[in-house]
């Protein structure tokens, strides 16, 4: 594995390898809190869009592995404001670092970066396209909290059009056996046709605008992504469409996930339930990203 750009670039065996390595990294965190396997290595974090969990968990992961971090979170303080192209930026920064993590508003930006970079590139989100490291921590959460991935029924609820975490996770789940996906969204925010075409025939699919979480194993909530709407009047039409309440899940044998940040789609009273796993899901981002950084570094040396 040279880069991590899209879930379409890796297979089931690659995923299982990363999940296995993530278990080892979680054990390292629980036992010692740190490792030195990336001692002397430098991670560059290039965030052209805001981030809290992804950026900080990558920085934490790198430092837990003994490495160092450079980067930016505000492009107004970079040469981007002077007109420097993305490819020039990547060529320069790949000379300063051993690994690059990039988040960018444009679909395809991470792929373009990987084509000119001298070091491995990790996609931390490119527009509404892909978010592969979130997908891997989502899969790790499912495996850790449910015990398996094959044979599960998973309901995705909310913004399935702009939700890159949904696109990546649906594509990854299509690699597993007997998975059923229930896609619940307003008509205006249905999952893109090209994602449906990719997973069609590989999973059992149903689409609806009504919440139905009977007999599902996993509820994956998402926020309506206001920042992706060109017309805010369109956002107002779908804002607050779905809201998961305590009484909806109290007696159900399922887990609730959310890539965060949350707005109002999960009531805060749900947080205390055993079914609520979204904060644990966020924690799992550290061992999973430790695993990704470690494996990319190892594969580069082969």
Swiss-Prot record:
L-aspartate binds at residues 82, 164, 223. GO terms for biological process: 'de novo' pyrimidine nucleobase biosynthetic process; 'de novo' UMP biosynthetic process; amino acid metabolic process. One of its GO terms (molecular function) is amino acid binding. Carbamoyl phosphate binds at residues 53-54, 103, 131, 134, 260-261. Pathway: Pyrimidine metabolism; UMP biosynthesis via de novo pathway; (S)-dihydroorotate from bicarbonate: step 2/3. Catalyzes the condensation of carbamoyl phosphate and aspartate to form carbamoyl aspartate and inorganic phosphate, the committed step in the de novo pyrimidine nucleotide biosynthesis pathway. This is Aspartate carbamoyltransferase catalytic subunit.
